[in-house]
Structures are given as structure tokens and as C-alpha cells.
Amino acid sequence: MSFQEIRILFDNGLVKTPVGVLAETNGRVLFEYDSAWVSGGVELSPFHLPLAEQTYRFESGRLPDRLPGLCADSLPDGWGMLIMDRHFMRQGIARNDISPFQRLAWLGDEAMGALCYQPSLRSSEALLEAIQIGVTAREAIQLFEGRILAAGRLLARIGGSPGGARPKALIGCAPDGVNFVSGAGSLPEGYSHWLVKFSASRKSITSEYGRYEGTLEHICLAMAAAAGITVPESRLIDDGSGVWHIAVRRFDRPSPSARLHSATASGLLHADHRLPSLDYADLLKLAWSLTSDMRHVLEQYRRAVFNLFVGNRDDHAKNHGYLLDGNGGWGLSPVYDVTFAGGPGGEHYTAYLGEGRQPDISILLKLAEQASIKAADARLIIGQAQSAVATFSALAKEQGIPSGLRRQIEKQLTQIGSSVCGKR
């Protein structure tokens, strides 16, 4: 089924409001806001689709996902794309023939954030099904490692929307914290929306790093919180086989039925997240332009500093997020996808004033100066990040990270600290 036109709606959990229409013709993508949405005054994409009663035109080949960033943010990354591609392949549609509009229609009402798309290829019934984490994890890992060719019906529904490369699923957590249901749609009262990431490596679930991937991200979030960064609630779930998976509470779903609009730097700036397309100077400017609030600028600076000291080089444009509150105000979302991760050629996806491999403290201080952050505040933030990362060894021991893997990461963190601040 092909589509030349997709309707975009805003779903706050109570009512769906028309936002606009997306169309494609002769290699161009066209977008028009609904006039009532323009009158409402809520800016969803202020830099590339500012509110106006006009037709926006884009050359589809010049857009990172052949869609305006407002809609491209709804598309998943590696894992969700894998599930989506396998679905269309079973319908006889080759990967290269899947249109962006078909992908949006496949997401339908179940995209992350508050946007939904019509017509939808999804069933309108939002069935709640009990989930066994171990069973779902095994299926997800087998698909991820190529041992099965397609996701089952339930995994396709709860695993096809989230972004990121790792296998994951949307779940609803019961008040008792031990029972789970499918979490793509609304949940019963008392339940909460979570995203569970299944620990796995590309080689084997028995590889050491793969088995502890979720635990290591859980540790990174604890260190980020200690560095003064806003983090989502997270917990570790045992699947019964000795592998722990990290579950993160969804910040775009603050209650069983409510939804918040989310956006990334990639979508807001039309920056390709597959390439090293941004600098932290860009993100600091974005924080001020979008929020006019120095608190968010300082928070963005904290994240830049922490990503450097913790060795999170997978800091691409989709890993910097924003939320739109119920009053139409923007703010940074809680941090996500923060862990020990490599980048292109050993560099950060997001550079520090053009330096991606070995930024040092002088660059961090200059970055702060350009963002009108006082040197004393910058040094305090740098010190807090260093102190937080220094707790890794104790946290890793507490969480049962094997000594060999722990020492390997400790060595990497020490090398980064020496590179940034100089050997002592």
C-alpha cells in the first residue's frame, strides 16, 4: 500500500487534534499546517516549520530521512527499523522500496511522543497482553543476532517504535513492579510506561560486555545524576537467565494515558544523526533559542562535560532531546542513551568546538565562555562530572560487574581524565 499524503495529529492522551498534512510529489515533500493549529500558537518545529498558513516545500533527497525533522523524529533507528523492514519484506516490499510515508503509517498511533499518523497500517485495537521479560528478551536477541528472520506479532508491536540500535520494547509496569504488559498504547490506572533495553552483543549474549550492557547503562545514569544531570528513573530487570536488562521510565508518557511531544536536535535542526553533524556549541545555542532559560543552557553544558568524561562518544544528533510541556513551553528532556560507547573513528559524534577526538579542559572552558557561562560555574560543573565518574569502580562492584571488565573501563576513564585535564 502506497501513500502520497499523510495526516499528522497531536495526541495529548485525551484528544487528537489535527496538526497538518504531509504530501509527496515529484521528489518534493510538502507540508501544510491545519489553520486551527496555526491559530492555537503551539510551535512544534520552530526553526524549519514555523507556524504559518503556507505550504512548506523540501527536496526529499536533501532531508536526512526524506522527511521534515518534525516527522523524521518519529522514525526509529536501527532496532525499530529492523523490525519495520522485516514486516514490509513479508509483504513483498524490498527495503529500498519502503517509502517514508509507509513508515509513518506503520507507526500510526504508536509513535514515540505525541504525534500520530493517519491513515494507519496498525490495528486500531490496543490489546493489553501480559509480557514475560525473559521470553520477549530471547526473541528480541535472536532477531537482533540474525537467528530468526522476523519479529512475532507482539514484539513487532512493542518493539518497532523506539529509537536506538539496541533491541528494546515498550512495556507497562504494574504497581507491584514485577508484572508487565504490552506498553505501546494507553495503560490501566496505576500502571506506568517504561522502555526496556535487552542486553546483547552483536556476537553472543554470553559475551561479557553484552551480558552487562544494561547494568553499565544503569551505572552511567547514576553517575549522571550525581553530576547534576536530570535523568529518568531506571531499574534492572532479571530475565531469569542471569542477564539483567535496563528499564527506563518513559518521560513522554507521564501518566497511563497522557502524552508529551518530544523532539531531538536532529529533528529540530534537520541534522543527520548518522553523521557527525553537530557541535556542542550548536546545542548550547539551541538550548537558549528554544527555551530562553539559562538553566537549560547550563544543563546542556553539564551533559557535554559528562559525555566527555564518561567516554560517551555515541552522542549523535538524535541523542539530545527536548520535551514540549502542556503549556507549549520547551525544555530539555531527561538524558538518555548515556553509556560507555564509541563513535566514528574513535571520535565524538558531536564535536567540542570542532574537536572530536581529544577535547581538553581549555576547550570546555572556551565552550562555556561562548555560551555566556561563567568560568567559575564551568569549573564547578567540570569538577562535579569528574567526581561523579570517579564513583564508577564502587558502583560497578556494587552491581556485580566482573573485575576484568571493571578494570578495562576504569582504565579507559582514567585515560580520558588525563587527556582532558593533563597528567598529574
Task: Please give the residue ranges for each predicted region.
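Phosphate/dinucleotide-binding and metal-coordinating scaffold of catalytic cores
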Residues: M1-A317, G321-R424
